[in-house]
Amino acid sequence: MAALRLASFTLRPAAAAAASASSGATPAAPRSASFARAARGLPSLRLAPPRRRGDLVRPRAEAAADSYASALSEVAVENGTLEQTVSDLEKLQKIFADETVAEFFDNPTVPREEKTALIDEIAKSYELQPHVVNFINVVVDNFRATILPEIVVEFENIFNSLTGTEVATVTSVVQLESQDLAQIAQHVQKMTGAKNVRLKTQLDPELIAGFTVQYGRDGSSLIDMSVRKQIEEITSEFELPDVPLEV
């Protein structure tokens, strides 16, 4: 399986950026809001899980992820920190991609002090915002660490909706230069008419060379500029139909 790496590139409208620069205005400092306050009433762990996990647990997990993401987005909007929050969550998404991390936090036999120490270490290492740290603590207290990746996805959907952002995934053999990513973002923006474009990049050596761009709802649209695609097209041109031979 190809090794994948995730990064982020954001394109903002040139007009908005120019207006901000010409005005000389300094952005207002974000106000403080507590995720713990916004998170009251969020679903917590049920110690007696239903037997039909495939039918019941997954929908409940998705509903819980949506609830957490909605509560966190309210705090981020109130603080004026939507972009910083989605950036922090993408950092957490990479950390919690390791299942052992989520299992550690959801293990009821692990002392809370040990969990707190690790949360503090993560917060310091990745310079997380205070309300995001509060968010992690609430998730851990409710034994919901295993659904954190789903929470991040739901939050990104909310962020994209609020900011008019189109997300595109660029897959290449080697990491593309920033100017190349900027051109791709501009192309996606022109094709979709989106106000903003966020690019996520990942590496896949199986492409041989070139790149692909997936965008649209659930990545339904694809731009394939890979050498692998070109080879497949050339190969198909030389494929001959089966001709029966008479013996």
Curated annotation (Swiss-Prot):
Transit peptide, UniProt annotation: 1-60
PROSITE patterns given in the database record: ATPASE_DELTA (PS00389)
Annotated GO MF terms: mRNA binding; proton-transporting ATP synthase activity, rotational mechanism
Gene Ontology BP terms: photosynthetic electron transport in photosystem I; photosynthetic electron transport in photosystem II; response to cold
Record flagged with keyword Cell cycle: no
The keyword Membrane belongs to this UniProt entry's keyword annotation: yes
A GO CC term assigned to this protein in UniProt: stromule
SUPFAM superfamilies membership: N-terminal domain of the delta subunit of the F1F0-ATP synthase (SSF47928)
InterPro entries noted in UniProt: ATP_synth_OSCP/delta_N_sf, ATPase_OSCP/d_CS, ATPase_OSCP/dsu
Subcellular location field: Plastid, Chloroplast thylakoid membrane
Keywords assigned: ATP synthesis, CF(1), Chloroplast, Hydrogen ion transport, Ion transport, Membrane, Plastid, Thylakoid, Transit peptide, Transport
Purpose of the protein: This protein seems to be part of the stalk that links CF(0) to CF(1). It either transmits conformational changes from CF(0) into CF(1) or is implicated in proton conduction.
Subunit (UniProt): F-type ATPases have 2 components, CF(1) - the catalytic core - and CF(0) - the membrane proton channel. CF(1) has five subunits: alpha(3), beta(3), gamma(1), delta(1), epsilon(1). CF(0) has three main subunits: a, b and c.
HAMAP family: ATP_synth_delta_bact (MF_01416)
Stated family: Belongs to the ATPase delta chain family.
Stated name of the protein: ATP synthase delta chain, chloroplastic
Gene this protein is translated from: ATPD
